[in-house]
């Protein structure tokens, strides 16, 4: 697979697009060399949308105080996240739709269903009952107000976690390409 480094500090559009179109993200935490992975609902906040608390792009998650991920993050704030757009490719078309519509729909979905992004960052459990926690909880609720996901944001023991993004690997299957990004502009080793 070809690989290139994005030397700019700007958050790549492929990552923004993938984060904006996905509902779930895979969170990986670690404690004493024992990894743990969780499928999570999340909120992506582009740079500037979380002022005055955050100026850069960030991701918001929530978890219970008694969860393994909460314990792991409290002990080791380094996390990895995986997000992809493949799920859009599995949506069924309307059985009553015309064959032209079905063809165009499938072609359109195929264009979007080839990217996966691995993000690395530092997770911070926000101070309980702080204005910052209230601010980010509200943003997270606005994203997760449908169905049963709201229960994972509200609640006495639910904590809000902010992840500052440090680096990423963007894999594009169509182009057999891996692009690397680093918030500081440094070259990432992997």
Curated annotation (Swiss-Prot):
Question: How many cofactors are bound and how?
Answer: Binds 1 FMN per subunit.
Give the keywords, sorted: Cytoplasm, Flavoprotein, FMN, Nucleus
Compartments, record wording: Cytoplasm; Nucleus
Pfam families recorded: PNPOx_N (PF01243)
Residues involved in FMN binding:
62, 69
Q: Which residues cross the membrane?
A: none
Record keyword Cytoplasm present: yes
Query: Which InterPro entries is this protein grouped with?
Result: PMP_oxidase-like, Pyridox_Oxase_N, Split_barrel_FMN-bd
Which cellular components does GO assign to this protein? cytosol; nucleus
Q: Which cofactor does it need?
A: FMN
Return the SUPFAM superfamilies for the record: FMN-binding split barrel
Name the protein family. Answer: Belongs to the pyridoxamine 5'-phosphate oxidase family.
- Recorded protein name is Pyridoxamine 5'-phosphate oxidase C1952.08c homolog
